[in-house]
Amino acid sequence: MKIHDFKMKKQEQKKISMLTCYDYPSACIVAESNIDCVLVGDSVAMAVHGHPTTIMATIEMMELHTQAVARGLGKQFLITDLPFLGHKSSQGHTVENVKRLLQAGAQAVKIEGADKDTCQTISHLVNAGIPVMGHIGLTPQSIHQLGGYKVQGKNSEQAETLLQQAATLEQAGCFAVVIECVPQDLAKTITDSLVIPTIGIGAGPGTDGQVLVWHDMLGLQTSFNPKFVKKYFRAKDHFIEALNSYVQQVQQMHFPANEHSF
């Protein structure tokens, strides 16, 4: 998938599929699938490193995981999150951070928020030829300011703010916008108001595409079960079953067998 395919898919009313990915083996699997695009999300701090929030993601962490995913990925378009405070200092520092992610293999960056400074930064990056994906609604990097993980845009004032933010991000040059944890009617209204595509997570079926976290949709963990996640596989259960089978065969001397020995 190429950058121009995002807008084309919206025009042709073809849904966009996006999935997070954090390592080389997973990227190799994704490469053999029909997934359109991959996000090396700052959720890696939680899903892989065990931190309680995405705020703990660093530019070094994002760079390392982007390199790993890029080595294994195929035709999918690769986007990487600019981590917490990665664009809140000088524009020069922001460009340097983005440069590191692009050199690591990212084809675009995703930036959370739509305040004046953020939109100016996005415009600066886009004018420099760097594709940027926006992100509104529940923005995990602002979790403390938002008062926790909860649905955004539930009242008319918040809804109007999100509509304005989406329009501002489009004007700033974003090629797509993630809408997270927003009522489905509002997400559909935002989607219909934009020329660029929207990617939803917890935003209903009316967005131009969907994104889920690898570990959530494959059932690799069972402690985090938000309403918007559908588990397409019970990986954790199958992994435990395989591990216990290995232990049993070792204890009963069924492994290694002759075919596993020299």
Curated annotation (Swiss-Prot):
Homodecamer; pentamer of dimers. GO terms for cellular component: cytoplasm. The gene is panB. It comes from Legionella pneumophila (strain Paris). Keywords: Cytoplasm, Magnesium, Metal-binding, Pantothenate biosynthesis, Transferase. One of its GO terms (molecular function) is magnesium ion binding. Pfam families: Pantoate_transf (PF02548). The active site is at E180. It is found in: Cytoplasm. Pathway: Cofactor biosynthesis; (R)-pantothenate biosynthesis; (R)-pantoate from 3-methyl-2-oxobutanoate: step 1/2. Belongs to the PanB family. Its cofactor is Mg(2+). Mg(2+) binds at D42, D81, E112. Its EC number is 2.1.2.11. Catalyzes the reversible reaction in which hydroxymethyl group from 5,10-methylenetetrahydrofolate is transferred onto alpha-ketoisovalerate to form ketopantoate. The keyword Metal-binding applies. PANTHER family: 3-METHYL-2-OXOBUTANOATE HYDROXYMETHYLTRANSFERASE. This is 3-methyl-2-oxobutanoate hydroxymethyltransferase. It catalyses: 3-methyl-2-oxobutanoate + (6R)-5,10-methylene-5,6,7,8-tetrahydrofolate + H2O = 2-dehydropantoate + (6S)-5,6,7,8-tetrahydrofolate. It is an enzyme of class 2 (transferase). Binds 1 Mg(2+) ion per subunit. Its main location: cytoplasm. Disulfide bonds: none annotated. It comes from the Bacteria. InterPro entries: Pantoate_hydroxy_MeTrfase, Pyrv/PenolPyrv_kinase-like_dom, Pyrv_kinase-like_dom_sf.
